[in-house]
């Protein structure tokens, strides 16, 4: 940070109000976003300059707890923004918002650091190539396909399966992916972060020595955590720290990087907390007035260039299941594909609880996925929509009052609904069912055959929690044999 030869710019704490610390500088004021450091017992606390108040006082946001800080203690201006370690040394490590290791394995030993605030790549550098990313999850690959170098949002309320879905995507994509991945845990449960680390170790995504201890050499993922118990400053910046590490692999090493964020809503929530602490007048629903700007600055950096790509998967919590809430609504415009998780579908016991009519992708076009895939997806949505429209009639009058054609549609829709469920690898310990990875060709063929009525005679339960259609047929035969 500051070089030994340069005279240090030193200030003193004049006020501490929770995570907000005011610092008085007698000489030179540090610019906005500069990192300051102060000692708190044995630890070094990083403060980021947020406002110039006048009278030589700067208002800063702490990246760590301020318990123990006192008025009058020294604060050192580092002369630069918060910088985090980048490069291969970060792989296999767990770091906090300022890039310090929290996995008790000693210093990172990185040869290079980069500031967490940066501009998005210029238009001339950006790439517009489209290639489909296979996830192995039927409902996603068929109805809302993801693209390499694209941005994906997993929207859902509390407890409908966002984290399980993001972990399955990590399992299916990151494990088979040759390049590197970065996972940013933003304001989520520490337990989930710990579970994910151990899953990566078991799967070999984080390499280990003969004693089972994690090592950087051979590891494929860097983890950056700023979890629920951290102050708002850390939660508002940890996504940027993770993104900076991903940008290094994209720009300096020309890699195709996977960037997972759980949860983007907590980034916005922390921004709202910081905004209130800084005394800004809130906008709609109490969010910060800079909501769209903050989101844009983060999202515009997550992009593909001619050197490499960043494919990002972001879990986005939806407060009170309201997709029109300003926080989830602010991220819609930035995404290439949206996967919406529905409480109504999860209550039916269908997992992943993806809403096939609400989820969308700009990649679902004949020129990208092909005519057969496109037509099958649209036919599936049409059948499900007709079923939805008929549900009121069924509830009031019963199935007997429907026409023959409508009864066929309802039967196929119910089979499709169940067939959109799928056992996950990461949920094997809970469900007792082995996880399934289904190739896109099998998915398209299976749904086309259901639409064409080839399996109208199979019981609906045969389609529940299976992989390809061949497994559904085998399950139906087994059910028939057991019933006989």
Curated annotation (Swiss-Prot):
Keyword Nucleotide-binding attributed: yes
Positions of disulphide bridges: none
Gene Ontology terms, MF aspect: ATP binding; ATP hydrolysis activity; proton-transporting ATP synthase activity, rotational mechanism
Origin: domain of life: Bacteria
SMART domains per UniProt: AAA
Pfam families associated with the record: ATP-synt_ab, ATP-synt_ab_N, ATP-synt_VA_C
Catalytic activity, EC: 7.1.2.2
Catalytic activity, as annotated: ATP + H2O + 4 H(+)(in) = ADP + phosphate + 5 H(+)(out)
Topology versus the membrane: Peripheral membrane protein
Subcellular location as annotated: Cell inner membrane
Predominant location: membrane
UniProt keyword list: ATP synthesis, ATP-binding, Cell inner membrane, Cell membrane, CF(1), Hydrogen ion transport, Ion transport, Membrane, Nucleotide-binding, Translocase, Transport
Positions of ATP binding: 156-163
Role: Produces ATP from ADP in the presence of a proton gradient across the membrane. The catalytic sites are hosted primarily by the beta subunits.
Protein name: ATP synthase subunit beta
